Regions:
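Conserved donor-binding/catalytic core segment of Leloir-type glycosyltransferases
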Residues: 11-13, 174-193, 199-202, 215
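Short hydrophobic beta-strand element within catalytic cores of glycosyltransferases
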Residues: 286-293
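Nucleotide-activated donor-binding/catalytic signature segment of Leloir-type glycosyltransferases, i.e.
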Residues: 230-251
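Acidic anion/phosphate-binding donor-loop and adjacent secondary structure
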Residues: 130-131, 149, 153, 163-180
Length: 364
């Protein structure tokens, strides 16, 4: 991929540094950087210090950040530095969730991003009501067919579908753990984000005779009182009759966590700020951990590789949980299907080929 006599230069526009706090937008941008070596990328780096190891490629632009989390100062710097760098690159690739501030950003697109080509990968949509007040930044990329249809219906025009990637070598298939079953919920403290439904479903499964240990690995968002929210979940679990459970904070080592669990329980009523294709689900499937999800349109892309229950239906979700824990052969079938799905549809080669082709199209 060449632009004239040199490598094309692309700005990866994110709301926080690539070496800061982990998030879907940061993960997607990092994966694009890592899979397209023929591109000269410009990206935001946390300063001073790094919350995680910085990418070894590209041109870092320092963003002052204490913890690498996209607080208001980080977002403001990203917009300011992005406006400056956008005039010095061949293409801008934005990774921005459609949230409260995005409508204003989209209307200021000529001022902030110039008039060059823009790719906008949409990790998720906080509230579909925002879609009525935005303008497309350029060529839009959705993570799922469901979101692509929704964006096209909102006059986003040219919308492509490129699912996220996960490296099978980084997430090897693991054998089923021995011992007492462990069920994992991993998510954010979001309204209707699934934690409460997971607790109620677990209680339903226990009443049906299932025995297991429930782990809730919770992540907070900027401005939340995580300790208070964790305690509220403990109180809800106790009130539901659960005795064998624990509520953890953010888990840094997902490899170790998934190695010790039997399945993922992720039943959000709405995805809110989470990605259409949550990274946690891909990590679980790649590791050979079956998943029980809610029947949201975005999850249709997983097909028969997962179990799905009506969103918000704790009774049906709990019945599926009890059934799967009692069916080791079905567990094996789902574990194999999940791994195969990840390798066939979410691998790095497919991801790189699609973004590479899109870049070539827009830069030609």
């Amino acid at each position: 991929m060449r632009h004239g006599e040199r490598r094309p230069r692309v700005l990866l526009l994110t709301s926080s540094p690539l070496d800061g706090a982990e998030g879907c937008d940061v993960r997607l941008a990092t994966d694009v950087l890592g899979t397209l070596p023929e591109v000269d990328f410009v990206w935001f780096s946390q300063w001073p210090g790094h919350r995680q190891s910085p990418p070894e490629r590209g041109r870092p632009v320092r963003v002052l950040s204490r913890d690498g989390v996209p607080h208001i100062p980080e977002r403001a710097q990203s917009a300011l530095f992005g406006a400056f760098q956008a005039r010095r690159v061949d293409l801008v690739h934005a990774f921005l969730t459609v949230g409260r501030t995005f409508p204003a950003f989209s209307w200021l697109r000529p001022l902030l991003l110039g008039r060059g080509p823009v790719v906008h990968t949409v990790p998720g949509v906080m509230d579909t009501g925002y879609l009525n007040r935005v303008r497309p930044l350029g060529t839009t990329v959705a993570l799922s067919e469901s979101m692509a249809r929704r964006l096209r219906a909102s006059d986003f025009g040219d919308v492509r579908v490129i699912p996220p990637m996960i490296g099978p070598d980084e997430w090897p298939y693991l054998p089923r753990p021995k011992g007492f079953p462990v069920v994992l919920f991993a998510g954010h403290h979001d309204p209707n984000g699934g934690a409460e439904t997971a607790i109620d479903a677990a209680a339903e499964a226990v009443r049906a005779g299932a025995r297991f240990h429930l782990v809730l690995a919770m992540r907070g968002r900027p401005g939340q009182d995580n300790a208070m929210l964790d305690e509220a979940l403990r109180e809800r679990a106790g009130a539901a009759g659960l005795t064998d459970f624990e509520v953890r904070g953010y888990v840094d080592d997902m490899h170790a966590l998934l190695a010790g669990v039997h399945l993922l329980l992720f039943p959000p009523v709405v995805l809110g700020g989470k990605a259409d294709i949550p990274l946690t689900v891909l990590q679980a499937l790649a590791s050979g951990r079956p998943a029980i999800l809610s029947d949201l349109p975005q999850f249709a892309d997983f097909g028969h590789a997962v179990l799905r229950a009506p969103a918000g239906d704790a009774r049906r979700t709990g019945q599926q949980l009890a059934w799967l824990l009692d069916q080791p052969r079905s567990w094996d079938v789902l574990a194999d299907r999940g791994r195969t799905l990840v390798e066939d549809h979410f691998g790095p080669e497919r991801f790189a080929a699609r973004y590479g082709a899109l870049y070539r199209e827009l830069l030609s």
